Amino acid sequence: MNAEIIAVGTELLLGQIANTNAQFLSEKLASIGINVYYHTVVGDNNKRLQKAIELAEERADMLIFTGGLGPTKDDLTKETIASTLDEELVYDEKALTSISDYFKRTGREFTENNKKQALVLNGSTVFANDHGMAPGMGLNTNGKVYILLPGPPKEMKPMYISYVEPFLCKFTTGENIYSRVLRFFGIGESQLEVKVQDLIDGQTNPTIAPLANDGEVTLRLTAKHHDADEAEKLIQHVEDLILERVGEFFYGYDQDFLHYKAIRLLKEKGLTLACAESLTGGLFGNQVTENAGVSSVFKGGVICYQNDVKQQILHVPEEVLRTDGAVSKQCARYLAENVKKLLKADIGISFTGVAGPDASEHKEPGTVFIGLVIKDEPAVVFSLNLSGSRQQIRERSTKYGFYHLFKKLEEI
């Protein structure tokens, strides 16, 4: 069975809010074997919504609507679908009582337009809204399945999980979709694709989908099977083939990002970290502190943007700054070594470079040096030549910092 998600709301078209509902629903539907082939966004306009419905009916078995179930005049999803299907709208007594009770509790007038929220398509299965007012509904008619859900994610998501997914499972073949994401760093998308292109071309179950994002590449392996263990075997077989070829660049699965991996290794090994940031201006430290309980391993950091701060606080020799410059291997080494000493940490890491858009110290944008020192070992400096916008260079430098930290910690 295939589905189309139709998000209703002019605010979506204007870019005032992001359509996070479509992402959530697509992922959930895929997990129960329903393929989403189209996402449509339409404003609060009866005629345009009607055209969107007619088009979706031509190409999808299931139409899933989000938004337009509220009390105002521009909330017209139910009315438009009722007109298109020639179905009557009737009051759902449970929803009507729930909405009425809410207004009584809050001492507000229960107006006719709020009463409208309890209207549902005649003959539909009603999905209770445990976090709002307007109920959702599902209707199987004329060979199509119509699902109507509220727009606010805080209402739609719990409604889907509690009521909608069990309803939808009646329409699936029992063949579910299982996915695993393999994460790679230090290899470009085109380089990785060349190494596994024959696997991508030859696989139908599981499929292999590459995606590049800010210096790293992911491969999503997706298998269909009615049995989870069999799907796991299908995915594992293809994963093994991939890692035989590009395993040196592999670092993790799914949402286990580099900064999570690096901090977890710090905790496991009982080591502490300090950072000195010039180029990245606190981005590295910010990502470090996204990890819960990181105070046990993160001593702190110094944002040393100007040269006098590098010299006075982190004791980079004036001669180094004068002859080699702040953007240099020598400066990166001193920053890493001295922030480690200053904050009494086991590990020091530093970032210096040119974010752009203009050159600095006769060095081009994207010139980056990352210093890393662990305990009493000699400092190591990694040189990078990155491309992209100012923000992309800073973010990618941060990611490279976590990558090199992670790889060094693996060796200990």
From Swiss-Prot:
This is Putative competence-damage inducible protein. SMART domains: MoCF_biosynth (SM00852). SUPFAM superfamilies: CinA-like, Molybdenum cofactor biosynthesis proteins. It holds the Pfam family MoCF_biosynth. InterPro entries: CinA (IPR050101), CinA-like_C (IPR036653), CinA_C (IPR008136), CinA_KH (IPR041424), Competence-induced_CinA (IPR008135), MoaB/Mog-like_dom_sf (IPR036425), MoaB/Mog_dom (IPR001453). It comes from Bacillus mycoides (strain KBAB4) (Bacillus weihenstephanensis). The gene is cinA. The lineage of its organism: Bacteria, Bacillati, Bacillota, Bacilli, Bacillales. It comes from the Bacteria. Belongs to the CinA family.
